[in-house]
């Protein structure tokens, strides 16, 4: 048979297609670069504040005239961000190089390697090919993903070599659409190495043959980060509002502070919602445990944060800071700077002053004057606080009042309220939030800063806020402010405000017709048509009405869960409402969304106010066992049932009767073949130990009763006949021969043995 070769015409056609594809990629990259420049110019223009306030915005051509300020060049250097840098163009990869790196990216994503050894050899070849082309690959639209995957797989030596390759070009890289993601990934993956080197746990990797050790490899990771900061320092004012550079600054600030890198709050701060999640097989092995916990950082990092905050306050006046507070890109960075200042420096200084004994009054006055003379970010935002809050015409009061109703500025206000010193918070509460707390809680934007205020209120101030909010409960319900109601209940529970909890529950029930049974159907929207999570369209294509409905459902379910967790009347009300639901409504809760199904899981875990509560809840689900097992949300409810004991260890403790568990497993056994076809079904079958039920039923019964109290479990588990007889024999007195024993019936050796025992007795 002849070989299957391509004809000359096919080869020419393939070559033309490859050239056409390469040209298309080049045009796309050029178009993206031009688009990026236009966006940056518009971005700089959007940052321009009021021109008569002494602040001169940077021009669109990237230059900055320091003499444009009334005070001359000195004021220009102080008030203007330095944007006088020329963005570098690192060139483009050749067609063959681009095709090679794109193919390598596809192979790494698919992870289709015969063995790990071949995969390691492949990676070594990719690293060799990458040498000298790091900047081109990082700024390439089609190959930057490969760079991110390689960073995830890199060891410490390779990360340091990337710092060396990027060095001197970081300002162009962090402001580039694609290269900025590579820089962020490099920063975040290198952060744990600093702690390892600091503690002495780091071990140097062996150098491959034929490779020379560079100066960057000999340097510590701490020095490499500090060199990067030195390079970005003069452009800090510009990077605060740059679309891509601001993310890199936030990542560096989080790394310098030693905060956990894998927390949900940290990830949402560093990445936008549209950020593509890039991973690769084997990255988890390189992931350090330090990423998920607070890391020890050197003192130079703390000093670097202080310098960044000081430079930020020096390069902008109060007006520029207020404009930055309402800037969509600059606000998150300003939030992080303010939070770090309040948590690392202001509160730390207060503790030192409390613990340190003052020798005399003169030294105390000198220290007070020094602290007052220090310019802080908090002092620039709310000068002369807390005394200034008493007068609405002061700069501090105007700033807070202007931020309360602003959708972007209110987020900065939340950070300020959460972390500010107690004296400033008391001033905010007494003069701004306290007198009008009920109206602020009604507003869809101002309610979020007001909720942060509720979280810090004392017992007496919280009782006063509840008293003012009770008449507004019907308005809260109509406007869907369930997060406000939940916060009021939770804070009263933490502050042991039983009377306030009962008053809030009464007001909430009256808003729903004074009937506890209506609470769950209304809050969980069981009477409305809610689209299941599996059938929901992409968030980009959802209508605003659908988004609002999902938002209200989420907050309503959180309120139900909070009430269920509060013992007493709130828990009793929710359990009564759940017990009164129709089986179809319970099934809808179990299968519609994660929010509603989690309520059923928590209800099964909560001690019952009515002894039959758990039994009633499970009986509503019994006719739909197969539907639950194949549902993403319902399977969690089904798995929770088997984890509960069959008999309560104490009165009102969570328990599901054993005959109900047997009913469920027997129904699952009827659908065994169907369950094995789906991942969810296999998970439920494995959790309920269906194979044990089919082949060793007495072992399954014993396993199912392991969660029961010790006394009930021993009495109920079926045992073998020999075990029962042995246990009964141990309970009988020594020499006992049974109540029906007749010595006359004994014959032979047994009779002689009995007569001998009688004679000895």
From Swiss-Prot:
Q: Where in the cell is it found?
A: Nucleus, Nucleolus
rRNA processing among keywords: yes
Q: List the source organism.
A: Sordaria macrospora (strain ATCC MYA-333 / DSM 997 / K(L3346) / K-hell)
The UniProt entry, under InterPro entries, shows: ARM-like (IPR011989), ARM-type_fold (IPR016024), NOP9 (IPR040000), Pumilio_RNA-bd_rpt (IPR001313)
Name the record gives this protein:
Nucleolar protein 9
What function does the entry list?
A: RNA-binding nucleolar protein required for pre-rRNA processing. Involved in production of 18S rRNA and assembly of small ribosomal subunit.
UniProt similarity note: Belongs to the NOP9 family.
Query: GO BP, one example?
Result: ribosomal small subunit export from nucleus
Q: Where is this region: Disordered?
A: 1-56, 350-372, 712-739
């Amino acid at each position: 048979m002849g070989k299957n070769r391509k004809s000359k015409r096919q080869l020419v056609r393939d070559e033309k297609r490859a050239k056409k594809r390469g040209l298309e990629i080049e045009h796309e990259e050029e178009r993206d670069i031009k688009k990026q420049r236009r966006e940056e110019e518009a971005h700089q223009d959007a940052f321009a504040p009021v021109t008569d306030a002494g602040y001169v915005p940077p021009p669109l051509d990237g230059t900055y005239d320091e003499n444009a300020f009334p005070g001359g060049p000195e004021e220009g250097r102080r008030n203007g961000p330095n944007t006088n840098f020329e963005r570098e163009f690192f060139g483009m990869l050749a067609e063959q190089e681009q095709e090679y790196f794109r193919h390598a990216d596809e192979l790494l994503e698919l992870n289709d390697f015969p063995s790990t050894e071949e995969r390691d050899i492949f990676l070594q070849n990719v690293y060799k090919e990458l040498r000298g082309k790091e900047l081109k690959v990082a700024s390439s639209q089609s190959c930057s993903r490969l760079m991110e995957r390689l960073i995830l797989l890199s060891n410490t030596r390779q990360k340091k070599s990337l710092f060396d390759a990027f060095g001197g070009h970081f300002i162009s890289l962090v402001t580039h659409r694609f290269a900025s993601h590579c820089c962020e990934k490099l920063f975040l993956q290198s952060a744990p190495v600093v702690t390892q080197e600091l503690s002495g746990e780091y071990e140097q990797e062996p150098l491959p043959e034929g490779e020379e050790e560079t100066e960057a490899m000999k340097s510590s990771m701490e020095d490499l980060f500090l060199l990067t900061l030195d390079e970005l320092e003069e452009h800090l004012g510009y990077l605060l509002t740059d679309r891509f550079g601001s993310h890199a600054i936030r990542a560096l600030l989080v790394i310098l502070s030693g905060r956990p890198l894998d927390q949900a709050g940290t990830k949402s701060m560093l990445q936008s919602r549209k950020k593509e999640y890039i991973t690769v097989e084997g990255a988890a092995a390189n992931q350090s445990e330090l990423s998920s916990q607070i890391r020890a950082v050197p003192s130079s990092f703390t000093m670097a944060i202080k310098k960044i905050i000081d430079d930020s306050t020096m390069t902008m006046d109060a007006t520029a800071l207020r404009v930055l507070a309402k800037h969509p890109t600059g606000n998150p960075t300003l939030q992080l700077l303010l939070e770090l200042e309040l948590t690392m420096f202001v509160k730390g200084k207060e503790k030192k002053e409390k613990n340190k004994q003052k020798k005399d009054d003169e030294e105390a006055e000198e220290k007070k004057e020094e602290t007052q003379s220090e310019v802080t970010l908090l002092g620039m935002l709310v000068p002369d606080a807390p005394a200034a809050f008493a007068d609405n015409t002061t700069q501090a009061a105007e700033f807070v009042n202007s931020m309360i109703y602003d959708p972007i500025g209110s987020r900065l206000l939340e950070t300020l309220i959460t972390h500010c010193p107690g004296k400033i918070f008391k001033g905010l509460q007494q003069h701004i939030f306290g007198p009008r707390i009920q109206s602020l809680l009604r507003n869809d934007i101002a309610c979020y800063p007001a909720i942060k205020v509720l979280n810090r209120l004392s017992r007496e101030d919280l009782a006063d806020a509840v008293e003012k909010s009770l008449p507004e409960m019907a308005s809260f319900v109509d406007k869907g402010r369930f997060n406000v109601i939940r916060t009021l209940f939770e804070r009263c529970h933490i502050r042991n405000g039983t009377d306030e909890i009962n008053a809030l529950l009464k007001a909430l029930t009256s808003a729903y017709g004074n009937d506890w049974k209506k609470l769950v159907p209304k809050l969980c929207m069981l009477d409305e048509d809610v689209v299941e999570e599996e059938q929901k369209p992409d968030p980009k294509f959802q209508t605003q009405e659908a988004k609002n409905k999902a938002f209200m459902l989420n907050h309503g379910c959180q309120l139900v869960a909070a009430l269920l967790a509060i013992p007493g009347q709130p828990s009793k009300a929710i359990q009564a409402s759940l017990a009164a639901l129709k089986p179809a409504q319970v099934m809808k809760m179990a299968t519609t969304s994660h929010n509603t199904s989690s309520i059923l899981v928590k209800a099964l875990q909560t001690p019952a106010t009515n002894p039959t509560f758990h039994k009633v809840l499970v009986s509503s689900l019994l006719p739909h066992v197969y539907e639950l097992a194949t549902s993403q949300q319902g399977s969690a409810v089904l798995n929770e049932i088997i984890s509960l004991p069959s008999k309560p260890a104490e009165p009102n403790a969570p328990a599901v009767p054993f005959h109900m568990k047997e009913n469920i497993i027997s129904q699952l056994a009827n659908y065994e073949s169907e369950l094995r076809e789906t991942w969810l079904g296999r998970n439920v079958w494995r959790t309920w130990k269906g194979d044990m039920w089919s082949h060793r039923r007495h072992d399954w019964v014993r396993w199912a009763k392991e969660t029961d109290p010790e006394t009930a479990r021993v009495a109920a588990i079926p045992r073998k006949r020999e075990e029962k007889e042995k246990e009964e024999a141990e309970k009988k007195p020594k020499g006992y021969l049974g109540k029906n024993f007749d010595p006359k019936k004994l014959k032979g050796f047994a009779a002689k043995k009995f007569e001998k025992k009688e004679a000895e007795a």
